[in-house]
Amino acid sequence: MSKENRDTGRAERAAAVRADQARKERNRRIGLVALIVVILGAVVAAGTWYGGGGSADTPSASVAASAGQGSVIAGKAGAPVKVVIYEDFQCPFCRELENSTRDFLRENAAAGKVQVEYRPIDLLQSTYGERAMNAFAAVLAHSTPAAALKLHDLLYDNQPYESDSASVSPSQILGLVKKAGGDNPAVETALKTQDAAFFQAASEVMSQKKITSTPTVLIDGKPVTGGVPDIVKAVENAVG
């Protein structure tokens, strides 16, 4: 098969995945709106309003970070449980998994119970996903693993809707890099062009591992099946 045919096939698969995830995201939003309406109705009926800080601004446990092959790793190599997460920075289900597991995994990684490897891939081929992944690659290569891990988190915290993927500008991405502590002249230079080698390596991993959806999660080398709730349950059961 020619390179042109391979690229065309990959683009078609990415378009199909984007369409499927967009449909699922629309359904999820409809469900969330309905739930919010019910909750607000209950609050009004009770005549009370809860106003307080949530956990979104609470920092995760401090954990040692190291660089992998196209990835950032949280936790020690000797941890009894190994979790690998293949993810796309634009994938809404990856963000859902992040929101559901980040604190749990970091706390247990800090305690030596699990090692977590975050491996970004460009499955959806979206504007935000590619800008985010390129920034991650730049920080991973030219700054510190700790900054790359922090940037990873910030990129999910600031993920736009898929329909608004281009809304986060390169200057805003740079702002996240600075907030993560990963800014330096080499990183800023790297941000000006796409890291073709990093993207190609991620594409090859996708082909080798036959990854067709995100998030794809491996626990001790074995893939976890099901949706995000199933993955969360499997991770929590494995770590204990």
Give, region by region, the residue ranges found by the protein language model.
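A generic local structural motif
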Residues: G68-V72, R102-D103, A202-V205
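A short beta-strand-turn-helix
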Residues: A64-V81
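Processing junctions and N-termini across compartments
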Residues: I85-D88, I211
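C-terminal cap of thioredoxin/glutaredoxin-like
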Residues: K3-L32, V37-A45, G51, G175-G240
